[in-house]
UniProtKB/Swiss-Prot annotation:
Basic and acidic residues bias spans: 817-903, 923-967, 1003-1049, 1058-1078, 1107-1128
PANTHER family: EUKARYOTIC TRANSLATION INITIATION FACTOR 3 SUBUNIT A, EUKARYOTIC TRANSLATION INITIATION FACTOR 3, THETA SUBUNIT
Cellular localization per UniProt: Cytoplasm
Subcellular location, principal: cytoplasm
Family: Belongs to the eIF-3 subunit A family.
SMART domains: PINT (SM00088)
Quaternary assembly: Component of the eukaryotic translation initiation factor 3 (eIF-3) complex. The eIF-3 complex interacts with pix.
GO cellular component, as recorded: eukaryotic 43S preinitiation complex; eukaryotic 48S preinitiation complex; eukaryotic translation initiation factor 3 complex; eukaryotic translation initiation factor 3 complex, eIF3e; eukaryotic translation initiation factor 3 complex, eIF3m; multi-eIF complex
Protein name (Swiss-Prot/TrEMBL): Eukaryotic translation initiation factor 3 subunit A
Length: 1138
């Protein structure tokens, strides 16, 4: 052992020197002294301590010093568990790897030693020493060799695993390493078949899990609340479960299942379906090995449900195989006992109900399953329809059909099918014996319902797969569980069923197929019925007895209570005081203990924090110093390593680098290395392409040849398959016919057997009728009395009901008569109104005709006035033209000849309207014809507008027309007919009489004179031109300029609003509201070019005139227009404003 303290580097050199001279113990002591020295253990980084630790562990493995290795590992963990976890992980993995390598080497050495001993003397294989050793210890040579050579290393490896698990159990940074080591320990137990070590390992892991579930204040503690920790623990327990099943340690497997269920319940996240499927599969296997068929079937059913719901790519064959497995496991469950409470007199441990409840929790079931509930769930999930026909028949034969004579034969056929196909039904073979037992029990129960006694010989014929000893055992078990009443007569070799009528079979109806109840069941129900009847009779005979007894008992109880109430009250108070004192004492003790523990934990944590802080400061200073020293060297080597490493990551780069040594790599730069890499890559690519082409050709030829050779084989296979299918169908059909014949014979025999019971049935019915005759007569009398009372009651009700119906009918007739009279009055009123309306219509027509005649007279006068005015205009125009020519001649006297310009000729002597007279006669005649047609259309439609004209009677009175005539023709002399814009070029200068078709007035002009109807006013240029009454003077492009022939009218001061426009001046109805001009019927006079009515009716005064010479109006006329517009704001016009 070293006598002085030395640095870690020197200690490692000295240890190597001791190893070279063959003193490993001295080397181990030297390295151990370094770890024990508190001065150096935290002063160096992992780069210095890690090689020393590897050497230390190597010596411990060589010398098998597991306790010394444990001490060093704990010291190393304390140094680097918060600084460099990877270093700690590397050290532990390296330690375990060395231990495993030495153990495997020892195993190989042990096998080699046995082989040498066996081949030592071929002539004398069994030596006297080997014979004596085998007789004394019972071991062979391999076992003895393993005990001397292999066992010490196995023990060392086991201790190494335990030390590492104990080392890492509370470190959250090494949690993954902890679970990896646990799996390595499981593999160790499997490899060397160490069952006792496996049990201790399971207990150790369970203890660690309990420790981490408790609260911990350590900074490196593992928390079970983290999802990662829960998942790691769950994976480890699943691995433990697999290992326990492989080693057939079913008790440990069951404990692992409990741990897995606890972890899944603790986890906030739902386990993945794959984990749940693995869990149910292993749980079913454990229940099967434990002989618990009920929970085994329940686990398989849960697995079937999970797989069916979540596995999307489940094939039909897999589903059928799983369904058959579940159905057969469910049907193999032994029939339950009729009185399971008898088991509690036999069980020494917990009651069966508590055990079943605990197992049900593992399956996630609210209550323990039963055979009946599982079969009901299987039927609900449609499992019998998913399996093949033979298993579907198996379910029907055991649970549905009642056929004891053929039951065992049918089940034997299913058993033979399962045993014949061992490869396909490997999972179903373990259920054969259980299925046979269930079949025998079904047979015995069905036989007991048909026969009172049966011989052993006959019963053995019905159950071919059971001998007499097994049958007798099953009969005794049935009686033991009180399932059935059976008596065995060995003298006569017979069995008697249900002979004891004083004892019932069970408290409820037996499950499965049932033909009839046992005699004991009938006796049991008879007694219950008798008790009910007697109780009712006693209550009728003595109605007050029970009430008196209850009152007496209540009085006694009250008296007894008053006697003992004070004593009981004091006793309860005293007991309560004792309990309170005990609680206070326990609470004080708990508080004191908790305060002491908290104080101790606080002191320990404070010391640990101070030590940790000091160590971290020292390590930080040491790392900072080394970092500055290593940065310069690292920068130099970094660039070259990165280039080489980048190239070495590819296969062609590795091949290229393998051709160069280190000196050659150092001589090359990055570009040269990249160039060589590219050359190598191109060469490999060419080689690969050539290989692929040759391979493609080879595969193509081979595939074609193979398919050609397969054709005759396929044809032969199809021919053989057709023959086999036909033979199979014929055999199946023959079997079906035979079964149908057998069933027919069985039904006929059954009918013949039951016919013998007809006389007994008839005798029983006659006797029963004679007994019940008196009771029938008495009930008949009561029924007649009740019938008479009910008849009287219903007759009275019918009288009241009919009286009410007659009253309702009278009221309905009276109401209908009133309604009829009101209808007659209404029809008479409507007829009167129609007659009055017709009289008003005729009156309006007469008035319209009178007004028309007046309008025609007025129109003739206006035409005469217009003609005179037109002649005055022409005369004035000629005078103006003569005056203008004279002035021009006087002006040309002094103007030079070069400046004289030919002036445009003045208007023709005929005046402004001369061109209207000279218009083409065809156009004038066409417009005259159109005016006549419009006039006729207006007269035809006049009847439809009588109502509207009637409201304008007050504006159409003759007095107003006469007043207008007295005013002179100058007032309306400006109303010259204007043509639409489309006709300006042809008839714009035509006289009003000429445009209207000569002197005959048109119907359109008549309507314009009296205002016309709404549709006539809307059909002209008022709507097309969007003219509004408040607009200023129109532009030339809208209506044209002021016409020259309009000037005289404007000078006279006449206003166009003074013209007779009765309908438009008062645009109101008789009720005082304005008419909706735009809402009138269809527009009339729609002919012509512009839709405003051509010919006589097309010359509406709103139509825009043709272009003419523009001349500004006088100021007086503009002022007069403003006055007219101002006065028109509330007048007749209904033209929209802009």
């Amino acid at each position: 052992m070293a006598r002085y303290t030395q640095r870690p580097e020197n200690a490692l050199k000295r240890a190597n020197e001791f190893i070279e001279v063959g003193k490993p113990l001295r080397a181990l002591d030297t390295l151990q002294e370094v770890f024990r020295n508190k001065r150096w253990n935290y002063a160096y980084s992992e780069t210095v301590i890690e090689p020393l630790m590897f050497k230390y562990l190597y010596l411990c493995v060589e010398l098998k010093k597991s306790h010394i290795a444990k001490e060093g590992l704990f010291q190393y963990r304390n140094m680097f568990q918060l600084v460099n976890v990877n270093s700690l992980e590397n050290v532990i993995r390296g330690y375990l790897k060395m231990a495993e390598e030495h153990t495997e080497a020892a195993q190989a050495q042990s096998s080699a030693a046995v082989a040498v001993l066996e081949l030592d003397d071929l002539d004398n294989i069994a030596t006297p020493e080997s014979i004596l050793m085998s007789a004394v210890c019972g071991e062979d040579a391999q076992d003895r060799s393993d005990r001397t050579i292999l066992l010490p290393w196995v023990k060392f490896l086991w201790e190494s695993y335990c030390q590492c698990l104990e080392l890492l159990r509370v470190n959250t940074h090494c949690e993954a390493l902890y679970h990896d080591i646990a799996r390595m320990a499981f593999q160790f137990c499997l490899k060397y078949n160490r069952k006792s070590e496996f049990r201790r390992l399971c207990d150790k892991l369970r203890k660690h899990l309990e420790d981490i579930c408790k609260s911990s204040n350590q900074t490196t503690g593992v928390s079970i609340n983290k999802v990662e920790t829960q998942q790691l623990c769950l994976d480890t327990r699943l691995y433990l479960l697999d290992s326990a099943i492989q080693m057939e340690l079913w008790q440990e497997a069951y404990k692992a299942i409990e741990d897995i269920h606890g972890l899944m319940a603790m986890s906030k996240k739902t386990p993945v379906p794959k984990t749940m499927a693995n869990y149910y599969q292993k749980l079913a296997m454990v229940f099967s090995k434990a002989g618990n068929q009920l929970f085994h079937a329940a686990a398989l059913l849960k697995l079937f449900q999970l797989t069916r719901e979540l596995k999307k790519n489940l094939t039909k064959d897999d589903l059928q195989r799983m369904a058959a497995h579940v159905l057969l496991a469910t049907l193999s469950i032994p029939l339950p006992s009729a009185h399971p409470e008898f088991d509690r007199f036999i069980e020494a441990d917990k009651s069966p109900l508590e055990k079943a409840q605990k197992l049900a929790v593992l399956l996630g079931l609210p209550q323990p399953p039963t055979r009946v509930s599982l079969i009901r769930e299987v039927v609900r999930l449609n499992v019998p329809n998913l399996v093949s026909d033979e298993f579907r028949n198996l379910y029907n034969w055991l649970e549905v059909d009642f056929n004891p004579l053929n039951l065992c034969k049918r089940i034997q056929s299913i058993v033979d099918t399962i045993e014949s196909s061992e490869t396909e039904n490997t999972l179903l073979t373990p259920y054969i014996q259980s299925l046979k037992d269930v079949t025998i029990m079904r047979l015995i129960r069905q036989i007991s319902q048909v026969y009172e006694s049966i011989e052993f010989k006959r019963l053995l014929e019905l159950a071919p797969f059971c001998n007499i000893f097994e049958l007798e055992k099953l009969l005794v078990e049935s009686v033991r569980h009180n399932d059935m009443q059976i008596r065995i007569d060995h003298q006569r070799n017979s069995i008697y069923f249900g002979t004891d009528l004083t004892e019932s079979q069970r408290e409820y109806r037996p499950d499965g197929p049932t033909l009839q109840s046992m005699p004991s069941e009938q006796i049991r129900s008879q007694l219950v019925n008798m008790s009910t009847v007697l109780t009712r009779a006693v209550s009728i005979v003595y109605p007050n007895r029970e009430r008196d007894q209850r009152a007496k008992l209540r009085t006694q109880m009250v008296q007894h209570y008053h006697e003992i109430k004070d004593r009981e009250h004091q006793r309860i108070l005293q007991r309560q005081k004792i309990i309170e004192d005990r609680k206070e004492f326990i609470e004080k003790q708990n508080n004191a203990r908790e305060e002491e523990e908290a104080r101790r934990h606080e002191e320990e944590s404070r010391k640990a924090k101070l030590a940790e802080q000091k160590r971290l400061e020292q390590e930080q200073e040491e790392r900072e110093r080394k970092r500055h020293e290593n940065e310069i060297q690292a920068i130099k080597e970094k660039s070259l390593k990165e280039k080489v490493q980048q190239i070495s990551q590819t296969a062609h780069g590795k091949k290229m680098l393998s051709k160069l040594d280190e000196e050659g790599i150092k001589k090359l730069d990055a570009e040269q290395i990249a160039m060589r890499e590219s050359e190598e890559l191109q060469r490999e690519r060419k080689e690969l392409q050539s290989k692929l082409k040759s391979q493609e050709k080879k595969i193509d030829y081979f595939e074609r040849a193979k398919r050609i050779e397969e054709i005759p084989l396929f044809e032969k296979y199809l021919a053989e398959k057709n023959v086999k299918d036909k033979e199979f169908w014929e055999a199946t059909e023959q079997t079906r016919i035979e079964n149908a014949i057998a069933e027919r014979k069985d039904a006929v025999s059954q009918q013949d057997r039951l016919k013998r019971m007809y006389p007994d049935r008839d005798e029983y019915l006659e006797a029963l009728k004679k007994e019940r005759a008196s009771l029938y007569v008495e009930k008949l009398k009561k029924f007649d009395i009740a019938l008479a009372e009910e008849r009287k009651k219903r007759l009275a009700d019918r009288v009241v009901r009919r009286r009410e119906e007659r009253r309702q009918a009278y009221l309905r007739a009276k109401e209908e008569e009133r309604f009829r009279k009101e209808e007659e009055i209404r029809h008479a009123r409507e007829a009167e109104e129609r007659a009055a309306a017709e009289a008003r219509r005729l009156e309006r027509e007469a008035e319209d005709e009178k007004r028309r005649q007046q309008y025609e007279k007025q129109r003739a006068k206006e035409e005469e006035a217009e003609r005179k005015i037109q002649e005055d205009r022409e005369r004035l125009a000629r005078e103006v033209a003569v005056e203008r020519e004279r002035s021009e001649k006087e002006r040309d006297v002094w103007r030079p000849r070069a400046d004289r310009v030919e002036r445009p000729s003045a208007a023709p002597a005929g005046g402004a309207s001369e061109w209207r007279r000279n218009a083409p006669p065809t156009d004038r005649n066409e417009r005259t014809d159109r005016g006549d047609r419009n006039d006729r259309n207006d007269r035809n439609d006049r009847n439809d507008r009588n109502d509207r004209n009637d409201r304008n009677d007050r504006n159409d009175r003759p007095e107003r027309a006469e007043r207008k005539e007295n005013d002179g023709g100058a007032d309306s002399s400006w109303r010259v007919r204007r043509e639409p814009e489309s006709q300006r070029g042809t008839g714009a200068g035509m006289d009003r009489s000429e445009r209207g078709g000569g002197g005959a007035p048109s119907g359109r002009d008549d309507k314009w004179r009296r205002g016309g109807d709404r549709s006539e006013r809307l059909g002209g240029d008022r709507d097309r031109d969007s003219f509004r009454r408040n607009d200023g003077p129109r532009r030339d492009d809208d209506r044209g300029g002021f016409r020259r022939d309009d000037q005289p009218q404007r000078e006279t001061g006449s206003n166009w609003r003074d013209s007779p426009r009765q309908n438009d001046r008062d645009n109101r109805r008789t009720t005082g509201e304005r008419r909706d001009v735009r809402g009138a019927g269809p527009k009339e006079g729609g002919g012509g070019v512009s839709g405003g009515g051509a010919g006589g009716g097309g010359g509406n005064w709103r139509t825009a005139p043709s272009p003419r010479e523009e001349k500004a109006p006088p100021k007086r006329e503009q002022a007069q227009d403003k006055e007219n517009k101002a006065g028109d704001d509330g007048e007749w016009t209904s033209v929209k404003r802009r």
